[in-house]
């Protein structure tokens, strides 16, 4: 018995399904729905280029070629005008039906979060407590002046750095002055260590004494110089 011929299932591939088989070099329509695509007519000018138009309108060169049915080697100046495909927003297609959702979104954006409400209430409490305190009783100096490093602005940080540098300079200058004033005292304490220096310090300068021998030597030298 001959096997019964198999019939192709309904909705199969090919022409029965309604889809067109792609071939090399064929022009295929865009996969985007034509309802979401809006075409803008551009009048060509001598300085226009395909890349420049793509950058100007925010589309790709392939989209412009596909919309105007241009091949790769074709020049854009074969036509007087080019159609630029621009995708429209999905909300524009509802014709105002989505206005309620937009209003709800706007209300959600306007409403503050719980964290913001808590922080604002905390600030108000701090301000109220500060105003309730008498003017005479202020915060201690270390609490009033000390602020966290991450809360300091750039100018405050630079001012703090300058003050620290000036304080370090003053401390270094004071140390130098103390060192200069202490040097002579140390020097004077070193000299009297030897007994001869101690004797000179006590008795004063030793007077010169001339003996007969020194006198004769001096006379002989004078005679030699005279000759």
From Swiss-Prot:
The annotated regions of Polar residues compositional bias extend over: 143-152
Which PROSITE patterns does this entry report, sorted A to Z? LYSM (PS51782)
- Write out the ranges of the annotated region (Disordered): 95-157, 169-227
Q: Where are the transmembrane segments?
A: none
Q: Which UniProt keywords apply?
A: Phosphoprotein
The residues covered by the LysM domain are 40-84
Q: Where is the composition biased (Basic and acidic residues)?
A: 216-227
Q: Does the keyword Phosphoprotein apply?
A: yes
Q: Could you tell me which residues carry Phosphoserine? A: 23, 33, 99, 166, 181, 194, 212
User: Which residues fall in a compositionally biased region of kind Acidic residues?
Assistant: 98-108
Q: Per its UniProt record, what CDD domains does this chain match?
A: LysM
List, alphabetically, the PANTHER family matched: AND PUTATIVE PEPTIDOGLYCAN-BINDING DOMAIN-CONTAINING PROTEIN 1-RELATED, LYSM AND PUTATIVE PEPTIDOGLYCAN-BINDING DOMAIN-CONTAINING PROTEIN
**Name recorded for this polypeptide:** LysM and putative peptidoglycan-binding domain-containing protein 1
Organism, as annotated? Rattus norvegicus
Q: What is the lineage of its organism?
A: Eukaryota, Metazoa, Chordata, Craniata, Vertebrata
């Amino acid at each position: 018995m001959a096997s019964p011929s198999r019939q192709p299932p309904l909705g199969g591939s090919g022409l029965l399904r309604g889809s067109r088989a792609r071939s090399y070099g064929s022009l295929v329509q865009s996969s985007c729905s034509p309802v979401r695509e809006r075409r803008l007519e551009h009048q060509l000018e001598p300085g226009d280029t395909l890349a420049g138009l793509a950058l100007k309108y925010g589309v790709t060169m392939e989209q412009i070629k596909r919309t105007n049915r241009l091949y790769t080697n074709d020049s854009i100046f074969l036509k007087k005008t080019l159609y630029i495909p621009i995708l429209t927003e999905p909300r524009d297609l509802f014709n105002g039906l989505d206005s309620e959702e937009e209003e709800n979104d706007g209300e959600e954006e306007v409403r503050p979060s719980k964290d913001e409400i808590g922080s604002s209430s905390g600030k108000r409490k701090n301000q109220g407590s500060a105003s309730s305190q008498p003017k005479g009783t202020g915060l201690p100096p270390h609490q009033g002046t000390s602020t966290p490093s991450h809360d300091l602005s750039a100018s405050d940080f630079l001012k703090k750095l300058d003050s620290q540098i000036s304080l370090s300079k003053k401390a270094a200058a004071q140390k130098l002055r103390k060192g200069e004033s202490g040097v002579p005292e140390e020097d004077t304490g070193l000299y009297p260590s030897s007994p001869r220096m101690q004797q000179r310090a006590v008795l004063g300068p030793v007077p010169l004494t001339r003996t007969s021998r020194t006198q004769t030597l001096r006379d002989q030298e004078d005679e030699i110089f005279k000759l």
